[in-house]
C-alpha cells in the first residue's frame, strides 16, 4: 500500500518537473546508435518548447516484450486468475480440455488470436476484470521485478506445447528519449493496444524511468466500477472532464465492458485525432508492429515539418512488411498528386541497440 502511495506522489512530482524548461538538455541519448541519436537530437532541438508532441506504442516499442501477455500467465501461475473467476461474457468458445491438459486462460487467449487479432486484443485486456486497480498495481510491480521466464502451455497446430514468456524489460534508450522530449517541452503520449490502466502503472510510475504523465497514457478502456456506490467511470472520461482522480481510482474495480477509445490497428490513428489533436500531427511516432502501429506511423507524423518515425525492428518478418507498406503508400501518394512522405524520415533500430 505504501509503495502505491509513493508511486502516486512521485508521479505528480514528475509531471510537475519533467517538462520544466530549466532541465532542457539534461538527458542524453546514450543508448542509441550515434546516427539515430543525432537525428533525434536535431528533431528535438528544432521543436523544443513549441507545443509539439510525440506518440509511442508501449509493448515491444517502449520496453521489450509484452505486459499483458506476461501478466496473464503470471497471475494464472499465482492462482489469481482462473477459469472459474473469468467473467461469463469472456467465455466465447468452449475450453479445449484433454485428460492430460486442462486448458489455461493463456492458451485460450492464443486460440482467440487464431480467430483474429481483433478478437484477442480486447480479450486480453478484459481478462483482468474483477480486480481493483490497487490489486493490479501490486501485481504489475511484482511482475516487473520477477526477472525470470514464465512457463506456459498452449495449443499449436492442435498439439499441446510448452514455452515461456518474459516480463517487460525496460529499454534504456526509450527512457532517455521520453525524458529528453519532455525536458524540452515536447509532450509525450503513449498509444497502446493494451489496457490503459495496466500500462499507466508502468510508464507513469517514476521508478520505471519514463516519467510519462498519467493523463497522457491512452489505451484500451474498460469501465471502472465503484462497488460501494455502483458508480461507473473511466480514467479517460475523468481526464476529458478535467476530474481525474488517480488516488480514488485505485479502489475501483475493472469491469469487462469496453468503451471508446479502442486503440488497436487504425484505432490508434483515430485516437490521435479524437483524443489528442484533430489537426496538429505529432512530430515523432514510435512503433514495432506493422498492422497495429502502421496507420499512426504512416498517417500520423508531420513529415512535411521534419517529423520522424522510430521503428523498433524486433522481428525479422515485420521489417519487410513495414517497408513494403511505406513504399506502396509513397506510390499511392504520388499517384494522387500528394506530397510523397510515407517513405521519408524513418529511424530504424534493433532492440539490442536501445537496451
Annotate the PLM regions.
Residues 27-39, 45-47, 51-53, 138-189, ...:
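C-terminal cap/substrate-recognition subdomain and adjoining C-terminal extension
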Residues 68-70, 75-76, 80-165:
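A metal-dependent, Asp-based hydrolase signature
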Residues 1-2, 192:
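Charge-dense, intrinsically disordered terminal/linker segments
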Residues 66, 118-119, 197, 266:
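A generic alpha-helix surface/boundary motif
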Residues 2-14, 22-58, 66, 71-93:
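Non-catalytic pre-domain segments flanking phosphatase-related domains
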Amino acid at each position: 500500500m505504501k509503495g502505491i502511495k509513493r508511486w502516486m506522489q512521485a508521479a505528480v512530482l514528475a509531471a510537475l518537473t519533467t517538462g520544466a524548461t530549466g532541465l532542457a538538455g539534461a538527458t542524453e541519448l546514450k543508448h542509441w546508435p550515434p546516427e539515430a541519436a543525432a537525428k533525434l537530437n536535431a528533431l528535438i532541438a528544432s521543436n523544443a518548447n513549441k507545443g509539439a508532441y510525440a506518440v509511442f506504442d508501449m509493448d515491444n516499442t517502449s520496453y521489450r516484450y509484452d505486459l499483458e501477455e506476461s501478466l496473464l500467465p503470471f497471475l494464472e501461475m499465482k492462482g489469481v486468475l482462473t477459469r472459474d473467476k473469468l467473467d461469463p461474457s469472456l467465455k466465447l468458445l468452449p475450453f479445449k480440455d484433454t485428460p492430460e491438459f486442462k486448458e489455461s486462460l493463456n492458451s485460450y487467449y492464443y486460440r482467440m488470436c487464431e480467430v483474429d487479432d481483433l478478437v484477442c486484443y480486447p480479450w486480453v485486456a478484459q481478462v483482468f476484470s474483477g480486480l481493483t486497480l490497487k490489486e493490479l498495481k501490486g501485481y504489475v510491480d511484482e511482475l516487473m521485478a520477477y526477472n525470470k521466464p514464465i512457463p506456459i502451455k498452449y495449443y499449436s497446430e492442435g498439439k499441446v506445447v510448452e514455452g515461456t514468456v518474459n516480463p517487460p524489460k525496460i529499454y534504456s534508450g526509450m527512457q532517455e528519449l521520453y525524458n529528453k522530449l519532455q525536458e524540452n517541452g515536447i509532450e509525450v503520449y503513449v498509444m497502446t493496444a493494451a489496457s490503459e490502466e495496466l500500462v499507466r502503472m508502468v510508464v507513469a510510475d517514476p521508478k520505471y524511468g519514463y516519467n510519462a504523465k498519467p493523463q497522457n497514457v491512452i489505451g484500451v478502456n474498460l469501465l471502472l466500477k465503484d462497488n460501494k456506490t455502483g458508480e461507473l467511470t473511466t480514467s479517460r472520461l475523468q481526464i476529458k472532464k478535467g476530474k481525474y482522480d488517480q488516488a480514488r481510482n485505485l479502489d475501483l474495480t475493472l469491469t469487462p465492458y469496453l468503451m471508446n477509445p479502442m486503440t488497436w490497428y487504425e484505432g490508434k490513428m483515430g485516437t490521435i485525432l479524437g483524443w489528442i489533436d484533430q489537426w496538429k500531427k505529432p512530430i515523432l511516432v514510435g512503433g514495432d508492429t506493422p498492422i497495429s502501429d502502421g496507420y499512426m506511423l504512416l498517417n500520423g507524423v508531420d513529415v512535411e515539418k521534419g517529423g520522424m518515425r522510430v521503428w523498433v525492428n524486433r522481428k525479422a518478418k515485420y521489417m519487410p512488411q513495414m517497408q513494403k507498406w511505406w513504399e506502396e503508400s509513397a506510390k499511392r501518394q504520388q499517384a494522387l498528386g500528394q506530397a510523397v512522405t510515407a517513405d521519408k524520415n524513418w529511424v530504424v533500430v534493433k532492440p539490442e541497440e536501445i537496451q
